[in-house]
Each structure stands twice: as structure tokens, then as C-alpha cells.
Amino acid sequence: SGETEDVTIADIVVGLRIEEELGDAAVYAGAK
């Protein structure tokens, strides 16, 4: 148990890192 939560947190962290690097591009990619 707890694996799903860990994956979710990891995905959020990766998403934040990508957003910092790509800026608006990450927003558009996330919208699709």
C-alpha cells in the first residue's frame, strides 16, 4: 500500500520540473 500515492507525488514533482524548464509549452502539453 502507499505505492499509488508515491507515484502520484513523483508525477507531480516531474510535472513541476518540466513546467519550470518548458514554461508555457508544458501547460499546452498538459492540456492535451
Swiss-Prot record:
Pathway where this protein functions: Carbohydrate degradation; glycolysis; pyruvate from D-glyceraldehyde 3-phosphate: step 4/5
EC numbers: 4.2.1.11
GO biological process: glycolytic process
GO molecular function, one term: phosphopyruvate hydratase activity
Annotated SUPFAM superfamilies: Enolase C-terminal domain-like (SSF51604)
Chief location: cytoplasm
Compartments, record wording: Cytoplasm
Enzyme class: lyase
Description of how the protein assembles with itself and partners: Homodimer.
Name by which UniProt lists this protein: Enolase
